[in-house]
Amino acid sequence: MYFVPSWYHGNEYKENEQYFYVRRAVTEFDDSVKQIQMFNRNDIMEYKILNLSYSPNFRHFLHRQSVFHAPYWSCFDAIQEIRRTKVDILSYHDLMWPEHTEFVYTPFCIVAYVNNMKYAEVHFGEDGNMIEVFLFQSEVMIRKNVYDDRGFLSVTIIYENNQPIYEQYLDGKGNWKLCHFFEDGHIEINGENPFYLIDNKRYKFNCLNYNSMESLIEEVFSTYLDEMTSTDDIFCLAMHVLHHDMLEKLFEKRKTILSFYQNRLELFDDAELKSLIQNTNYCIVDSKHKISLLEDYAEKKLPIVDITPFDTRADFGISQQLTVQNILVPIDTIEQSKFEELILLFAKYFETNETARVHFFTRNANWDRIDSVLNF
């Protein structure tokens, strides 16, 4: 079983680590996390994560999801020819600094000064690991270095007038592998090292210039599927608008399970997308009301199963000790009118069951309905 998650930052093939002092506005938990946790805990069958996003701190992410030892393949590790697998500690003291550098410790980052001029800012992730270093010239940022949690410089981004111009993805020795230009999104491959790595075997890129990051990822991912998987393998694909087109091309004749989660049910007029849904072996949704939406779109009955992302197994050893009845209500997708009806329903229920407790559950850190509930 292979899992292709949609762990992206917006509409970019990357998922950078968050600064430790920034409140997380979007939860990391999704359907892929839950499915992988199930396979990891129960030893159901062999599985592997196929990660298409640039994730320099992927090991820390897996650790936060309690699946640190989950087997995975990283598309960007293949592109950058990274062979390292273990987390390694890299301190800012290990970097090369100019003479007479003075470090000032602030609540948010470490600021380096040279001759009383700001030279750099060192930023850290949620686990205290160094993730980025901003470099300055005359108080203006000119470069951002992104560090991998395996202990090396992974990407360097060049700025002009405080705007990113291009970014270079590096190999484990600091040599640039590809250059991504932000203005039009095109990619240039280093002609002196035009290779990527699949299972310790080097393959040559088809060309040295690509119109987009997606076309580059598609080439490398296609090679991995051809060389490392068989047509009998099963792929659980987290549907996402960013990689719809790629999945339609690469998985047309493979065994697939399509997983739709929360707001990722984006159905639009696209013949290939409709064909992918019509021909899949199974669809997974997180609520029953999405079943009719999918079948109306596909214009046929589909093999669909709705699986809640929450752990609904009863733990009788704990449940029998509780003196209250806890009711968990996910509310992110509930309309205001339905939400008000729900409050009235619970109000009547509380009149007959004094032990009931309702817990409204949201993944939105900026949820603003608290006052409306209290003053209803």
Segments and roles (model prediction):
Residues 221-229, 260-282:
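Membrane-proximal helix-turn-helix segments that form the acceptor-binding/catalytic region
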